[in-house]
Design a protein with these regions (language model features):
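A contiguous loop/helix-start segment that scaffolds small-molecule binding in enzyme catalytic cores
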Residues: 2-3, 61, 72-76, 132, ...
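Class I SAM-dependent methyltransferase SAM-binding "motif I" and its flanking Rossmann-like core
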Residues: 1, 12, 83-157, 199-202
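A generic local structural motif
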Residues: 14-20, 38, 63-65, 121-122, ...
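Calmodulin-binding IQ motif helices
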Residues: 252
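Class I S-adenosyl-L-methionine
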Residues: 1-110, 115
Length: 252
């Protein structure tokens, strides 16, 4: 018996991996967070499968369902949104499974930041503009940021930032990042990426909060910040396409 933590992607059922879909199709038990994973993703479960929306369940409730499946020798598809390794809250589940001696595997999924970049038709790393992407969040009531991971520290890098779970903290984001990126730095708020009502709000550090308030977006949004978002035409081509680079490959 194995628990499969499956990344379902950001919302679009077509973005789940082949492996993830096959496991959902074969597992007799499927646990999914209905608030983040659309029913269309788990519709592929066997007709006689036990399919449970865990949105209202506690961690103990979820583990009880897994233990019950374990006692019956039934594999479990534990379906999470995006990629389970990023803000997936699987670490505490894995800790419980290890203590119980229950086997598990992780199936990666498409993260919201990758799907959003695709939806926007942009690259997040641009030669001589930004070559780093930082995935982060801001402190909320439920969880503080470890020392050194605050935006006032990360902003010093000048990297492209993908800020998760923080759309209600835009005032703080502006305050912390303007000293490093400037008021006119591009910002894009990606709302419900991969869902039918997906939307993108474009602005700058100085005006994005007002635009998001006008759009009445308060959750399920990802915030991109950084000069690479401008996608201007005046950046250097990647060395990957340089003639000398191509010639060096021929002589390897």
């Amino acid at each position: 018996m194995t628990v499969h933590f499956i990344g379902a992607g950001p919302g679009d059922p077509e973005l789940i991996t082949v492996r993830g879909l096959r496991l959902i199709e074969s597992c007799p038990v499927c646990l999914y967070a209905g608030s983040l994973v659309p029913e269309a993703v788990v519709a592929a479960a066997p007709a006689d499968a036990r399919v449970i929306d865990t949105a209202s369940l506690t961690l103990d409730d979820i583990i009880d369902e897994i233990v019950a499946a374990h006692d019956k020798g039934q594999d479990v598809a534990r379906v999470h949104s995006g990629d389970p390794s990023l803000y997936g809250a699987i670490a505490e589940q894995i800790r419980r499974l290890k203590a119980l001696g229950i086997d598990y595997r992780i199936v990666p999924g498409v993260s919201a930041y990758a799907a959003a970049a695709a939806g926007l038709g942009i690259e997040l790393t641009v030669p001589e503009v930004a070559q780093s992407l930082i995935l982060t969040r801001t402190a909320m009531k439920s969880s503080a940021m470890p020392p050194g991971e605050e935006l006032t520290s990360l902003g010093r890098t000048g990297a492209t930032l993908a800020i998760h779970l923080s759309v209600r903290n835009l005032r703080q984001i502006e305050r912390d990042l303007v000293p490093f990126y400037g008021e006119d730095c591009p910002v894009i708020v990606a709302y419900r990426v991969g869902w039918p009502d997906e939307d993108y709000i474009h602005g700058t550090l100085s005006d994005i909060r007002a635009k998001v308030q006008e759009a009445k977006i308060t959750r399920t949004a990802l915030i991109f910040v950084g000069p690479a978002l401008a996608q201007t035409a005046d950046f250097r081509d990647s060395a990957l396409y340089d003639a000398a680079h191509a010639l060096s490959l021929i002589h390897i």
